[in-house]
C-alpha cells in the first residue's frame, strides 16, 4: 500500500509539473486590442479615451498603432474656452515576463515607445480666438501590464506618456 501511495504521489507530481519551459501570457502571433480611459489628463479637463492594437512579431516584441481623443471646456462669467486633442501613431512593445522570470500565463508585463502626430486645437468663444498651437510630431513611452481573466479577455494598466494622460486603464481583447 505504501508503495502504491508513493507511486501515485510521483505520478501526480509529474502530471502537474510543467515541462514547457516558460509559461507566457504573450506570444508571437497574438493580436491585442486595448480600449481604455486616461485617468490623469495632461489638460486637466475632459476624459481621454483611447485604443491600441498590437501584433506579436516575435515571442517578446509586438508592433501596432494607437489612437487617443480628448476634449474639454472651461466656462465662467465672460469667457468660454474649449479644446479638442487627437493623437494617432505607431507603437512597439517589448514584453518582459521572461526578463523578470515571471512564470504566469495570465500576466503580461511590457515597456514600449511610440511615435505619432498630435493635433491640438483650442477656441475661445468669448473673443473669437483659436489656434492649433501644440500640434505636431509626438513621442510617447510607457510601461504596462495586462492580466487575462480568460483566454481572450483581460484588463490593462499603462503608466508613462500614454497619449493624453500619464495613466491609462481598460479592457484587453486577445485574438
Feature locations, PLM:
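Residues that define the transmembrane beta-barrel architecture of outer-membrane proteins
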Residues: 29-31, 45-49, 82-88, 107, ...
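Residues on the lipid-exposed face of transmembrane beta-strands in outer-membrane beta-barrel proteins
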Residues: 35-39, 51-55, 90-96, 113-115, ...
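Short loop/turn motifs that connect adjacent beta-strands in outer-membrane beta-barrel proteins
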Residues: 21-30, 60, 97-108, 149-153
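Cleavable N-terminal export/targeting peptides
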Residues: 1-29
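Outer-membrane beta-barrel proteins
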Residues: 25, 39-41, 53, 76-80, ...
Amino acid at each position: 500500500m505504501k508503495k502504491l501511495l508513493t507511486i501515485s504521489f510521483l505520478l501526480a507530481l509529474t502530471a502537474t509539473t510543467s515541462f514547457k519551459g516558460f509559461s507566457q501570457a504573450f506570444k508571437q502571433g497574438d493580436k491585442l486590442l486595448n480600449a481604455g480611459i486616461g485617468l490623469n489628463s495632461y489638460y486637466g479637463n475632459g476624459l481621454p479615451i483611447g485604443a491600441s492594437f498590437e501584433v506579436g512579431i516575435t515571442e517578446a516584441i509586438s508592433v501596432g498603432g494607437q489612437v487617443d481623443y480628448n476634449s474639454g471646456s472651461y466656462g465662467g462669467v465672460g469667457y468660454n474656452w474649449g479644446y479638442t486633442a487627437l493623437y494617432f501613431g505607431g507603437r512597439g512593445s517589448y514584453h518582459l515576463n521572461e526578463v523578470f522570470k515571471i512564470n504566469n500565463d495570465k500576466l503580461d508585463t511590457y515597456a514600449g515607445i511610440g511615435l505619432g502626430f498630435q493635433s491640438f486645437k483650442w477656441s475661445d468663444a468669448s473673443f473669437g480666438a483659436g489656434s492649433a498651437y501644440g500640434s505636431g510630431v509626438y513621442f510617447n513611452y510607457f510601461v504596462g501590464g495586462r492580466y487575462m481573466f480568460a483566454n481572450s479577455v483581460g484588463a490593462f494598466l499603462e503608466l508613462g506618456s500614454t497619449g493624453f494622460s500619464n495613466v491609462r486603464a481598460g479592457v484587453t481583447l486577445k485574438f
